[in-house]
Amino acid sequence: MTKLIVGLGNPGSKYHETKHNVGFMALDRIVKPLNVQFTENKTFKAETVATFINGEKIYFIKPTTFMNASGLAVRAFLAYYNLTVEDLIVIYDDLDMEVGKIRFRQKGSAGGHNGIKSIIKEIGTQEFDRIKIGIGRPKDKMTVVNYVLGKFDKKDEITIFNTLDKVDKAVNYYLQTKNFEQTMQKFNG
């Protein structure tokens, strides 16, 4: 079993640890204990790392195309390594979920998320596994753009860091069991 795990976000220090970058944050958390480092790969327009977990080859990528063109990196990577959508898991933020909630899905629409829209457009299907991390909706009169590109307040930051630990455990559980549905049942919520 070879897997491609994609975290969505925007490249650059300006966007580091913003709400829209929880996909990048999740990958950083997952690979940290593996003693591997992401490196820039211009061919795929992504930061990439490959490693073996439980004897299986696992690729992690963070597209550097900016969110709205994430699908370009995903399509190129899948094609180059002859992987299928069944090998793909995408981790990203979700405005419609409470901060810190996790939802595993096996397919579905983009739900207004431009990174997911781009992936669906580029790979030609919405039938791929995903892990959504709730970031909540803006309060008051803040625009959605300013909200998702903003950092978490202190309370939500603690919640998100705990959530990232849960995502790390869930991904590792999945890589051991090779059963996304079982992982969904155990970790959704």
From Swiss-Prot:
<comment type="function">
    <text>Catalyzes the release of premature peptidyl moieties from peptidyl-tRNA molecules trapped in stalled 50S ribosomal subunits, and thus maintains levels of free tRNAs and 50S ribosomes.</text>
</comment>
<comment type="subunit">
    <text>Monomer.</text>
</comment>
<comment type="function">
    <text>Hydrolyzes ribosome-free peptidyl-tRNAs (with 1 or more amino acids incorporated), which drop off the ribosome during protein synthesis, or as a result of ribosome stalling.</text>
</comment>
<feature type="binding site">
    <location>
        <position position="15"/>
    </location>
    <ligand>
        <name>tRNA</name>
    </ligand>
</feature>
<keyword id="KW-0694">RNA-binding</keyword>
<keyword id="KW-0963">Cytoplasm</keyword>
<dbReference type="GO" id="GO:0072344">
    <property type="term" value="P:rescue of stalled ribosome"/>
</dbReference>
<feature type="binding site">
    <location>
        <position position="66"/>
    </location>
    <ligand>
        <name>tRNA</name>
    </ligand>
</feature>
<dbReference type="Pfam" id="PF01195">
    <property type="entry name" value="Pept_tRNA_hydro"/>
</dbReference>
<dbReference type="InterPro" id="IPR001328">
    <property type="entry name" value="Pept_tRNA_hydro"/>
</dbReference>
<keyword id="KW-0378">Hydrolase</keyword>
<feature type="active site" description="Proton acceptor">
    <location>
        <position position="20"/>
    </location>
</feature>
<dbReference type="GO" id="GO:0005737">
    <property type="term" value="C:cytoplasm"/>
</dbReference>
<feature type="site" description="Stabilizes the basic form of H active site to accept a proton">
    <location>
        <position position="93"/>
    </location>
</feature>
<dbReference type="InterPro" id="IPR036416">
    <property type="entry name" value="Pept_tRNA_hydro_sf"/>
</dbReference>
<dbReference type="InterPro" id="IPR018171">
    <property type="entry name" value="Pept_tRNA_hydro_CS"/>
</dbReference>
<dbReference type="GO" id="GO:0004045">
    <property type="term" value="F:peptidyl-tRNA hydrolase activity"/>
</dbReference>
<comment type="similarity">
    <text>Belongs to the PTH family.</text>
</comment>
<dbReference type="GO" id="GO:0000049">
    <property type="term" value="F:tRNA binding"/>
</dbReference>
<keyword id="KW-0820">tRNA-binding</keyword>
<feature type="binding site">
    <location>
        <position position="114"/>
    </location>
    <ligand>
        <name>tRNA</name>
    </ligand>
</feature>
<dbReference type="GO" id="GO:0006515">
    <property type="term" value="P:protein quality control for misfolded or incompletely synthesized proteins"/>
</dbReference>
<feature type="site" description="Discriminates between blocked and unblocked aminoacyl-tRNA">
    <location>
        <position position="10"/>
    </location>
</feature>
<protein>
    <recommendedName>
        <fullName>Peptidyl-tRNA hydrolase</fullName>
        <ecNumber>3.1.1.29</ecNumber>
    </recommendedName>
</protein>
<feature type="binding site">
    <location>
        <position position="68"/>
    </location>
    <ligand>
        <name>tRNA</name>
    </ligand>
</feature>
